Amino acid sequence: MNYGKEQVAVYRTYANPLEGVRTIPESSFDGRDNILFGLEVRVQFEGEEFLPSFSEADNTTVVATDSMKNFVLHQAGEYEGATAEGFLHFVGTEFLETYPHVEAVTMSATEYPFDERPVPGDDGFDPSDLVFRVSDDESAFGEIYLEREGDELRFEEQTSGVTEIELVKVKENSFTGYVQDEYTTLPEREDRALYISLDVFWTYSDPEDALGDEPQRYVPAEQVRDIAQVVFHEVNSNSIQDLIYQIGLRVLERYPQLESVNFEANNRTWIEVRDDLDGDAKVLREPPRPTGYQQFSMDRSDLEEQ
């Protein structure tokens, strides 16, 4: 039994910057200014006190979802951290402290991506600190679950992620050796272009690390995105399953503070129309529906087996 508010768009200018994150070989990302910090937030309340609103049309204990929206918007001005997960934890804690009859709250959000825009400077072009482009690129994701236990609040569940990574590798991918029977019409490919859409999610051994209070232990979505594209560049994979497994191993290797990593992938590979051109040139077209997908979960035991 739960209810809540979703698609709460909130924007904060000049939030505190994310600084001091640990750098990795696959990424140049070392922090962000957070001059423009935007989230689409979802709030979910749980509690037995809400049962009469369902069974008896008694709204005595109901916090209107419009009030939830206003609460989130107000707290965006109070939050002093630098991460989506930290904001969600902050707001969730404030909800539980404000409404003692709420037993648990799930807070989730997708971060709106904004790109810095180059403007002329003294020595060429520099990123503007005033103008940003609203981007259609991948987005960071966060979810936290807080519950009441007596007089204490427990925080033991979280998920972080980066969604809608879209990558195309023009060659050095294959797909061979799969089941061949009377239903098979797909030809094997020793070398093909590969187009994938990828969502990556991860959990920490200690959920507190997700909040960003200790930046060295925080895993930025930008770095995980960069790991995915670097591994895609390096690996000649024989399937998307093989590719996401290699990405997962690299993520777990780079971040010993993580407990697990999960994938949802979609195959959007273009179909070859002509391969009789010079060199590696090909003509391709959009694939027809339906499309293939893959889901996979890994934890530290997978890394230890390597």
Curated annotation (Swiss-Prot):
Task: Quote the catalytic activity from the record.
Answer: urate + O2 + H2O = 5-hydroxyisourate + H2O2
Residues reported to bind urate: 65-66, 175, 192, 240-241, 267
Keyword line: Oxidoreductase, Plasmid, Purine metabolism
Source taxon at top rank: Archaea
Q: Which residues form the active site?
A: 5, 65
UniProt-recorded Gene Ontology molecular function terms: urate oxidase activity
A Pfam family cross-referenced in the UniProt record is Uricase
Q: Per its UniProt entry, what is the enzyme's top EC class, as one word?
A: oxidoreductase
**UniProt entry tagged with the keyword Calcium:** no
Reported EC number(s) for this entry are: 1.7.3.3
Please state the pathway this protein functions in, per its UniProt record: Purine metabolism; urate degradation; (S)-allantoin from urate: step 1/3
Query: Which residue ranges does the record annotate as region Disordered?
Result: 281-306
Q: Does the keyword Lipid metabolism apply?
A: no
What is one process in the GO biological process aspect for this record? purine nucleobase catabolic process
Which residues does UniProt call coiled coil? none
Q: Record's family?
A: Belongs to the uricase family.
- What's its job? Catalyzes the oxidation of uric acid to 5-hydroxyisourate, which is further processed to form (S)-allantoin.
Protein name stated in the entry: Uricase
Source species: Halalkalicoccus jeotgali (strain DSM 18796 / CECT 7217 / JCM 14584 / KCTC 4019 / B3)
